Curated annotation (Swiss-Prot):
One of its GO terms (cellular component) is cytosolic large ribosomal subunit. InterPro entries: Ribosomal_bL19, Ribosomal_bL19_CS, Ribosomal_bL19_sf, Translation_prot_SH3-like_sf. Keywords: Ribonucleoprotein, Ribosomal protein. The gene is rplS. This is Large ribosomal subunit protein bL19. GO terms for biological process: translation. Pfam families: Ribosomal_L19. This protein is located at the 30S-50S ribosomal subunit interface and may play a role in the structure and function of the aminoacyl-tRNA binding site. It comes from Xanthomonas oryzae pv. oryzae (strain KACC10331 / KXO85).
Amino acid sequence: MSKLNKTILADFEAAQIQRKLPEFNQGDTVVVNVKVKEGNRERVQAYEGVVIGTKNAGLNSAFTVRKISHGFGVERVFQTHSAIIDSVEVKRRGKVRAGKLYYLRGLEGKAARIKEDLAAAAQAKAARQAAAKAE
């Protein structure tokens, strides 16, 4: 691919990436609000779970969220810049050392818990308080 084509492609991708989502990593518990179309009406459905993997590839970036629903593990892959994602909220920061948390698939109950990163939680709380004072 020529240099000109690469720059054109990069400019196109930059234009398509419109909104910023909060920063999250593997091990974080997130709530993804997804737009669901049923018939002629549209509603927002919350999907809460643990981020077990991310793929950073520009416009094709994606992340996988795993939750336990009625005793069964359910995973869903979301395209980061998709129009069906209404918003993403980080509930808690997890402290993990692995890049992909696929080992959680084989664990259940208390064994599948992830330690909370208290330093990151305190830092986020301080940032929220500073933003509140600024307003």
